[in-house]
Amino acid sequence: MFVTRLEHTTQFLPQACKLEDEVLVLYAIYLNGFDYTLPRFVKREVQVNADGFVRFDYNIKMFDFARFTDMTQTTPEDIDDYINLTRINSLSDHDLKMLQLVCRDRWYKGDVARLRRILQQKDVDDLVKFVCNVMWERAYEDHYTLGQQLSIRITTKLIQSGLDFKHQPDTTAPVSVRGWEDATFEKYLQSITSISEVIKRHVFSKKYICLEVAASYWSDAVESLQQENFRIILNSKTPYVLLIEMDDDKNSMVYLRKLAHLLENKIVNLLFVTDVEFYFKNGNFMFYLYNSLKFYYYCLKNKFAFENVDKEIFFLLYTIVALEWFNGGHLNSFTLEKSALYNPLELSTRRLNSIKRAAQHNRVINCDSEINMDYIRGKRVRTGAHYGKRVVNFDLNQSLH
């Protein structure tokens, strides 16, 4: 185990034994059969009886870093104690707290590999500076309006989730092949793997209807659809679901009317259609909304039914689809100044710029000319923070000439 806990109470001893406190700790560890050479964190309590004799109550944590292989072996408090024990002489109180914060972040994420590397790292100055910038940036984002925060949440996969920012390499494995016996549809699904890709208004050349068939009617239903000359696409991984590929000159409503008898008798169930633009043009909001949500959710999560754990994804998808509807097919209700091709939600550089500002916010002003302030007309100090509560500190201890 990484952490070994020991509670030990001595017998009553003469007052002079208080000078031998460390020896008593080592003896307690040795007496209980543990390695007294390991780093240890000791909480001690001294009890004095009526005769003036003292008794020591030790609560000892011993750390064996070589055996730290699993998060379940420790707690965040243990990590804090280990950092206090090993870094107390090399870091200031502020830096110590920042290091504890980043280690706690890795502990809560279950990232034991990175946590081990951080705890082993000899020089953590650069890491502490990075954590400070992260904290500054998060405070900066807390002052965004709700609309700004929502747009960033949509366009950034890991907003405000510890240290996993967008500029770090994304190690997430791509979504596996869904099992459809149609390479074109599989490629379509692979083109939408994140919320930020949903906003690009994917319009595909082919149109599909996805149906779920009752297990007891599967063979008869497939045979009946084939007799009607429907182009059927089966799935090798998910049973009792199929795709119908539509003709280029038809829409899904034409096909659904043909399937009305099967739908009414609950032999088949509609999962989604991909030609949602048809319902947008015809003013059918509910069908446009329902099918958009179902299709995008399937692209992102490989699930046909919404699950409670994905409430945030559902909310973000609803926001995107509803904005498109109420803005006439566009996410933004205005034209972007720099380009009419992109909408504001697609500007990923906004986040990069805020990180650059965060890295440069700690600026030392050497003379009055650098302040660049007109004392007569008044002018804002250019700190680059866009943060109303931030102030410029003047060192009054230095003599002014």
Curated annotation (Swiss-Prot):
Record-annotated membrane-spanning stretches: none
Keywords linked to the UniProt accession: Host nucleus, Transcription, Transcription regulation
A GO CC annotation given for this chain: host cell nucleus
GO biological process: DNA-templated viral transcription; regulation of viral transcription
Source organism, top-level taxon: Viruses
UniProt subcellular location: Host nucleus
Disulphide linkage map: none
InterPro entries registered for this protein in UniProt: Baculo_p47
Effect listed in the UniProt record for changing residue 131 to M: Temperature-sensitive mutant
Functional description taken from the UniProt entry: Component of the viral DNA-dependent RNA polymerase which is composed of four equimolar subunits of LEF-4, LEF-8, LEF-9, and p47. Plays an essential role in late and very late gene expression.
Family statement drawn from the similarity comment of this UniProt entry: Belongs to the baculoviridae p47 family.
Assembly: Interacts with LEF-4, LEF-8, and LEF-9.
Name recorded for this polypeptide: DNA-directed RNA polymerase subunit p47
Higher taxonomy: Viruses, Viruses incertae sedis, Naldaviricetes, Lefavirales, Baculoviridae
Recorded name of the encoding gene: P47
